[in-house]
Swiss-Prot record:
The keyword Zinc applies. GO terms for cellular component: membrane. Gene3D superfamilies: lpxc deacetylase, domain 1 (3.30.230.20), lpxc deacetylase, domain 2 (3.30.1700.10). Pathway: Glycolipid biosynthesis; lipid IV(A) biosynthesis; lipid IV(A) from (3R)-3-hydroxytetradecanoyl-[acyl-carrier-protein] and UDP-N-acetyl-alpha-D-glucosamine: step 2/6. Zn(2+) binds at residues 79, 238, 242. HAMAP family: LpxC. This is UDP-3-O-acyl-N-acetylglucosamine deacetylase. GO terms for biological process: lipid A biosynthetic process. InterPro entries: Ribosomal_Su5_D2-typ_SF, UDP-acyl_GlcNac_deAcase, UDP-acyl_GlcNac_deAcase_C, UDP-acyl_N-AcGlcN_deAcase_N. Catalyzes the hydrolysis of UDP-3-O-myristoyl-N-acetylglucosamine to form UDP-3-O-myristoylglucosamine and acetate, the committed step in lipid A biosynthesis. The lineage of its organism: Bacteria, Pseudomonadati, Pseudomonadota, Gammaproteobacteria, Alteromonadales. SUPFAM superfamilies: Ribosomal protein S5 domain 2-like.
């Protein structure tokens, strides 16, 4: 049986909020089986809990944000959630003392390191996967995203940026998910932005914590970061990283193929909502270890500390 997972013990870190520029402290704590991922705003009195569910995603401009019925928000969850998804963590209590998750270096890599350093604990209940039975598709103009049946988790993703540096890079990628492939090929890809947008955002008191320490920054012609790119195709890989995080608010790892063209946070969330609403298009399944699709098989000692 493949079992549910949580962290072995509490781990804490500090960072900067991308939009506020303020210091943020975040803790990740173990949680019991079938708990899911729950985030808590500890800076409020009383503290406010928000479960990481698709219908709690109510803001998708520049990031993915959970917002409860009272308007309490936790923004920029996608990179942390990509790490949780990539390492197969089902249950965790995440406490944060600000309205946004710290941006760290703009990728999922610091979260992967944090989670692997504290260790991942198998629990005493079967892990449930969301298996796609029928194709679900959403569109917005020429942008689209779909989930369709596949025995594993495959991503087929394309971007289309009219920028010389991005156009020179590979803008299409197909990958079969595994934890090792995620950590090696996806987790280090950083968010990227354009100088012209950053100037506008800062004029509106946004992106105040953004810098070349936590983003790939481009002018009209080139990458401005002195050290350049981490991957030749870092742009499409970061969009895949975002999608991993955005899809994880489905509540379970997905068994299926995710295909997308020019999608972003809004369309990713629309896809998850459309999927969950069409209950005959999916089923929850568990696997014996020797029966699991290769995407979800865990090599001995690869993740658990």
């Amino acid at each position: 049986m493949i079992f549910q997972r949580t962290v072995k013990e509490m781990v804490k870190t500090t960072g900067v909020g991308l939009h506020s520029g303020n210091k943020v402290t975040l803790s990740i704590k173990p949680a019991p089986v079938n708990y899911g991922i729950v985030l808590v705003r500890t800076d409020l009195e009383p503290a406010v809990s928000i479960p990481a569910k698709a219908d709690q995603v109510r803001e998708t401009t520049m990031c993915t944000a959970l917002v409860n019925d009272d308007g309490v928000r936790i923004s920029t969850i996608e990179h942390l959630f990509a790490a949780l998804a990539g390492l197969g963590i089902d249950n965790a209590l995440i406490e944060v003392d600000a309205p946004e998750i710290p941006i760290m270096d703009g990728s999922a890599s610091p979260w992967v390191f944090l989670l692997q350093s504290v260790g991942i604990q198998e629990q005493s209940a079967a892990k449930k996967y969301l298996r796609i039975k029928d194709t679900i598709r959403v569109e917005d103009g020429d942008k689209w995203a779909e989930l369709k049946p596949f025995n594993g988790f495959r991503v087929d993703f394309a971007i289309d940026f009219n920028h010389p540096e991005i156009a020179r890079s590979q803008q299409h990628m197909v990958m079969d998910f595994s934890t090792s492939a995620f950590v090696r090929d996806i987790s280090r890809a950083r968010t990227f932005g354009f100088m012209r947008d950053i100037e506008y955002l800062r004029a509106n008191n946004l992106a105040l914590g953004g810098s070349m320490e936590n983003a790939v920054v481009l002018d009209e012609y080139k990458v401005l970061n002195p050290d350049g790119l981490r991957y030749e195709d870092e742009f499409v890989k970061h969009k895949i990283l975002d999608a991993f995080g955005d899809l994880y608010v489905a509540g379970h790892a997905i068994v299926g193929e995710f295909c997308a063209f020019k999608t972003g946070h809004a369309l990713n969330n629309q896809l998850v909502r459309a999927l969950l609403a069409q209950q005959d298009a999916w089923e929850l399944v568990s696997f014996e270890k020797d029966e699991a699709p290769v995407s979800f098989s865990v090599p001995a000692g690869a993740v658990f500390a």
